[in-house]
Amino acid sequence: MVNSCCGSVCSDQGCGLENCCRPSCCQTTCCRTTCCRPSCCVSSCCRPQCCQSVCCQPTCCSPSCCQTTCCRTTCCRPSCCVSSCFRPQCCQSVYCQPTCCRPSCGQTTCCRTTCYRPSCCVSTCCRPTCSSGSCC
């Protein structure tokens, strides 16, 4: 029996759970079996690219973080979910840190394990030849 608060739109996506039957969550893009969680069912998180089991976390379900390049298990952190860090090469567990999530450092040449130090994340040092312990 379909829950009355969900309706036909939500029931088609397998959204018959009690914790998912709310007006802000009853949308086809959000109400799915992998996204029917109270922490994920918010209007800002009801997007196809964000409603996945790896991304349904309170820290990742925000308008600025609901993107495929950021919403991953290794990058769903408050310090990484900023507009300046929204790049595929920056959303990795090795350099998802506040010191590296900045426009001048969000590049493949700088954001590496050997070059994500505060003193190294500057435009003059973000170069392949400089990404070493002796230089940075």
From Swiss-Prot:
An MF annotation (GO) of this entry: identical protein binding
Any one of the GO CC terms: keratin filament
Any matching Pfam family: Keratin_B2_2
The entry's keywords: Keratin, Repeat
Keyword Repeat included in the entry's annotation: yes
Sequence repeats: 5-9, 20-24, 25-29, 30-34, 35-39, 40-44, 45-49, 50-54, 55-59, 60-64, 65-69, 70-74, 75-79, 80-84, 90-94, 95-99, 100-104, 110-114, 120-124, 125-129
Chain intervals for the UniProt region annotation (20 X 5 AA repeats OF C-C-[GRQVS]-[SPT]-[VSTQ]): 5-129
Subunit structure: Interacts with hair keratins.
Family membership noted in the UniProt record: Belongs to the KRTAP type 4 family.
Protein role: In the hair cortex, hair keratin intermediate filaments are embedded in an interfilamentous matrix, consisting of hair keratin-associated proteins (KRTAP), which are essential for the formation of a rigid and resistant hair shaft through their extensive disulfide bond cross-linking with abundant cysteine residues of hair keratins. The matrix proteins include the high-sulfur and high-glycine-tyrosine keratins.
Protein name as catalogued: Keratin-associated protein 4-2
Gene giving rise to this polypeptide: KRTAP4-2
